[in-house]
Amino acid sequence: MKKILNGTDQVVEQMVEGLVKSHADVVHRVEGTRVIARNDKRPGKVGLVSGGGSGHEPAHAGYVGRGMLSAAVCGDVFTSPTPDQIYEGIKAADQGAGVLLIVKNYTGDVMNFEMAADLADADDIKVEQIVVDDDIAVEDSTFTTGRRGVAGTVLVHKIIGAAAEAGASLEELKALGEKVIASVKTLGVALSPCTVPEVGHPGFELGDDEIELGIGIHGEPGFTREKIMPSARLAKQLYERISSESKLLAGDKVVVLVNGMGATPLMEQYVFANDVHELLKNAGVQVEKTLVGDYMTSLEMAGLSLTILKLEDEKWVDMLKLPVDTIAW
């Protein structure tokens, strides 16, 4: 295992310290916690909290700041943060109008965020929760009941963040979030696995000429293994599955996110994005916005995911285009 670390037991602690020291103009650490909170406070605004296991950087701390999240909670690598840590995030985000929790659909995350919401309720903080389940690869897995929450979560952060910044109520934000979640679909592929520092070996093995379709962001293997193929053919496989799930038709408008899994160069991501654009053009589907880059990773996994957000409301594009002050958007 080759990693730039000072040992495996302090990796998250030192990452959090490095992050807040590097971006002290945007975020700060809530003392005694692994909560990253935005510096600017807006009384009367609904707070937005997300988080989960570390190892997916820049998610989620990279999306804390004006226009997006109020706070993010960092668990151990690929491990949900504890309810008490999440509760600290809720308190940091609360500005008197309630707090919305944006949770990826993993059993530990959902359970711990719900427990934290109960703690907040006992402290008279109104909390609502939405659960992102955009991964169409599998219905149930080692980590989930139902579909997993993956890169589409970042689009949810951005749209909900814009609405919150504009003064939407807690109930309005929850309803909007549920609409966006229902319209966003993701599917990923791995060219090589990742290694959790404390484990010391890859989560699965792939031959030099193999790829894994349907991988998760915790190093979970996918639903099928195939030989390496040209980008255009790979794009077609992922696109066709997503198109079928989303029932995309000629004339529909979409947002595309090509997300690097951690070790795939931008050159390859843009080659893939070009192939996706050709497929959408041939299908008569109009692309309103495209995002390409590492938005939600899986440590040093090589590969990418394709996310397509079907626009049920054209205002969502405007929300995605609004400027923010965060580390990673």
From Swiss-Prot:
InterPro entries: DhaK_1 (IPR012736), DhaK_dom (IPR004006), Dihydroxyacetone_Kinase (IPR050861). Its EC number is 2.7.1.121. It is an enzyme of class 2 (transferase). The keyword Transferase applies. Pathway: Polyol metabolism; glycerol degradation. The active site is at H56, H218. It catalyses: dihydroxyacetone + phosphoenolpyruvate = dihydroxyacetone phosphate + pyruvate. Residues 7-329 form the DhaK domain. It is found in: Cytoplasm. Keywords: Cytoplasm, Glycerol metabolism, Kinase, Transferase. One of its GO terms (molecular function) is phosphoenolpyruvate-glycerone phosphotransferase activity. Pfam families: Dak1. Homodimer. The dihydroxyacetone kinase complex is composed of a homodimer of DhaM, a homodimer of DhaK and the subunit DhaL. PANTHER family: TRIOKINASE/FMN CYCLASE, TRIOKINASE_FMN CYCLASE. Dihydroxyacetone binding subunit of the dihydroxyacetone kinase, which is responsible for the phosphoenolpyruvate (PEP)-dependent phosphorylation of dihydroxyacetone via a phosphoryl group transfer from DhaL-ATP. NCBIfam families: dhaK1. Unlike the carbohydrate-specific transporters of the PTS, the complex DhaKML has no transport activity. This is PTS-dependent dihydroxyacetone kinase 1, dihydroxyacetone-binding subunit DhaK. It comes from Listeria innocua serovar 6a (strain ATCC BAA-680 / CLIP 11262). The gene is dhaK-1.
